[in-house]
Amino acid sequence: MKIIYLHQYFNTPEMSGGVRSYDIAKHLVDKGHSVQMITTDRTPFNRGGWKVSDEDGICVHWLSLAYSNQLSYIKRLVAFFSFAISSSKKGGGLQGDVVFATSTPLTIAIPALYISWKLSIPIVFEV
């Protein structure tokens, strides 16, 4: 099965933060599924659009997008919606059998719904 997985704050074990979506995606890959993760690259000073990497068999699409809790409320909203729009375009151009979206933020539902509609595939929304 081809899975398009959306998680704005995806981390690998080498990164600080939760790795639940990594563990789920890795398990799916180990079971023979294809997983394309759409996420953000929050590395400071790393700008330039999208980059792609292979993380233990998970094809990860990283969008350079500045974000921190120190941003103003408006700037955080802009970051959430920038990711929603960019990931909608990215995911809509991929091939998949299902779209799986993990919140937070809840705005992850926007690209998930768009990709599901555009590709006519089911959606799983994990809160």
Regions inferred by a protein language model and the residue ranges of each:
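Glycine-rich nucleotide phosphate-binding loop and flanking beta-alpha elements
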Residues: 44, 106-107
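An amphipathic, basic-hydrophobic alpha-helix
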Residues: 62-99, 107-120, 125
